[in-house]
Regions:
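Long, charge-dense, solvent-exposed interaction surfaces that engage phosphate-rich ligands
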Residues: 146-186
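Alpha-helical promoter-recognition and RNA polymerase-docking modules of transcription initiation factors
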Residues: 2-127, 131, 135-149, 162
Length: 187
């Protein structure tokens, strides 16, 4: 790489999250036309500077999405780092001629990277790996808060049925995952 590349911000334990967030705010947001031109340039010529500008202009999006996963008890800096990997994948595969903005496309790659990190980080004993179990893992807390915001511990039968129906999983899977996530699982 040449010397005229961006000085990309790093997220370290020493600098802290606040310093990183201050750094990424310095990168300008792109308007639709500039984003399109940079993406086409990256796609057709492989111009790394164009790709870097696309990445740096979307680092705030990664941080915002990662903060939505704070409830899983994992280090935020690691979730942001994983989200950044997803952002880079999105830039690599982005097709600007389809008419969507990069943020719309990248959001799915960022979320997928963060969710995969969370799944890798949680013990396989704690969670499952089937599609239904992943759906349950990532949606149970949100649905519980919607249905019974003040409920602690085990769910009432009607809440279990409601969640099972909404997520298309068995009632036993809901009860089991709820116990796993609340730390009440019995071996």
């Amino acid at each position: 790489m040449s010397n005229n590349t961006y000085n990309l911000p790093t997220l370290s334990n020493e600098g802290g999250l606040a310093a990183y967030l201050a750094q990424i705010k310095k990168f300008p947001m792109l308007d639709a036309e500039e984003e399109y031109m940079l993406a086409k340039n990256w796609q057709t010529t492989g111009n790394v500077k164009s790709a870097e500008k696309l990445v740096t202009s979307h680092l705030r999006l990664v941080a915002k999405i990662a903060m939505g996963y704070k409830g899983y008890g994992l280090p935020l800096n690691e979730m942001i780092s994983e989200g950044n990997v997803g952002l880079m994948q999105a830039v690599k595969k982005f097709e600007p001629e389809k008419g969507f903005r990069l943020a719309t496309y990248a959001m799915w790659w960022i979320k997928a990277s963060i969710q995969e990190y969370i799944l890798r980080s949680w013990s396989l004993v704690k969670i499952g790996t089937t599609t239904a179990q992943k759906k349950l893992f990532f949606n149970l807390k949100k649905l519980k808060n919607q249905i019974a915001p003040r409920a602690e511990g085990d769910l009432r039968d009607e809440h279990v049925k409601d969640i099972a129906n909404k997520l298309d999983v068995s009632e036993q899977e809901v009860v089991s995952m709820n116990r796993r996530l609340s730390g009440k699982e019995q071996s």
